[in-house]
Every structure is written in C-alpha cells, then in structure tokens.
C-alpha cells in the first residue's frame, strides 16, 4: 500500500514510518525539515515530498504526493504551545489539505487527535466520551475531527 505520512520527522511520525516499512508498505514522507528526515535510518527507503501545509491551494495534492492509498496525518503546527492561537488557524489549513486529497482521489484517511480534545480530565479516556476542549490546541483538533466527520457524511 502507498501511504502518505505527514509530520514524518515528529516523534510519532518517525515510529509510524518505521513500522509501515517493516510491513512492506511504500511510504511517502512529508515534512518541512529535510535535514531532520535525513537523520533517520529509513530515509533512503521512503519517497520524500517537501510540503508546507497552509491555506487552501488549487494544486492537485493527490497527484503531487503520487496518489497515495492512505493518508496518516500527524502534522500540526504550534506544538508544544498548546494555548497559542495558531491552533485555530491550523483547523482551516489542515482541513483544506485533507479535503484537497479526498476531492482528488484519496480514499482512506487517519488523523491523530489529542487527549486535550477531552479537556483537563483525569483517568482513562474513551472515544465515545463527550469532548470538552479547554485549550486552543484541543479545540483545533476537535474542530478538525468534527469537520472531517461531517465531510464523511456528505
């Protein structure tokens, strides 16, 4: 399977890529930090496509990223500054990015959320719990999830 991984140089992204390669998937990695990407032992086993997730573009991102079958979306600007208002801007940018891929042929998407979508709670969290974000980061991730769920229904 051809898998596009955003946020490839992040902690989660680097481990996801390693596991995908172990399972013999073709990986397309994107990140703004090519030098950071080159430090991983798997760098020469992936296709690197530099891209900055920003405002909506008319460019066909599905073609740019060589027609992936699955997107694993891990990229998110502004971490670890959880109270920064950039997280509210991220909602539109990330939705436009994912929607462009879907509109142009992508069939399968996995987006990583955050425990902060549930607010400041103690104990185990479950997916069926009500979300109550209290930070711009949690709110941004929760809004993106809701927009994507609505898009799926349409």
PLM region spans:
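N-terminal Rossmann NAD(P)H-binding glycine-rich loop of SDR-like oxidoreductase domains
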Residues: 3-23
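Conserved catalytic-core motifs of eukaryotic protein kinase domains, centered on the activation segment
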Residues: 40, 80-86, 120-125
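Structural motif
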Residues: 2, 69-70, 108
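Conserved Rossmann-fold NAD(P)-dependent oxidoreductase catalytic core, especially the SDR/UDP-sugar
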Residues: 73, 95-135
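Catalytic Tyr-X3-Lys loop
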Residues: 81-95, 99, 133, 139
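Active-site Tyr-X1-5-Lys
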Residues: 134-154
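NAD(P)H-binding glycine-rich loop region in Rossmannoid oxidoreductase-like domains
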Residues: 51-90
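Conserved glycine-rich Rossmann-like NAD(P)H-binding loop of the short-chain dehydrogenase/reductase
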Residues: 25-34
């Amino acid at each position: 399977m051809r898998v596009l991984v955003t946020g490839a140089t992040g902690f989660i992204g680097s481990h996801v890529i390693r596991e995908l390669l172990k399972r013999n998937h073709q990986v397309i990695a994107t990140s703004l930090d090519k030098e950071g990407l080159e430090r991983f032992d798997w760098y020469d086993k992936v296709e690197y496509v530099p891209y900055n997730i920003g405002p909506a573009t008319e460019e066909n991102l599905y073609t740019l990223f060589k027609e992936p079958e699955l997107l694993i979306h891990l990229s998110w600007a502004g971490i670890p500054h959880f109270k920064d208002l950039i997280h509210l801007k991220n909602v539109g940018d990330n939705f436009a990015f994912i929607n462009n891929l879907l509109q142009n042929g992508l069939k399968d998407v996995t987006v990583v959320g955050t425990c902060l979508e549930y607010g400041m709670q103690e104990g185990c969290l479950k997916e069926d719990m009500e979300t109550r974000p209290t930070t711009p980061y949690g709110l941004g991730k929760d809004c993106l999830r809701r927009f994507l769920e609505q898009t799926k229904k349409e």
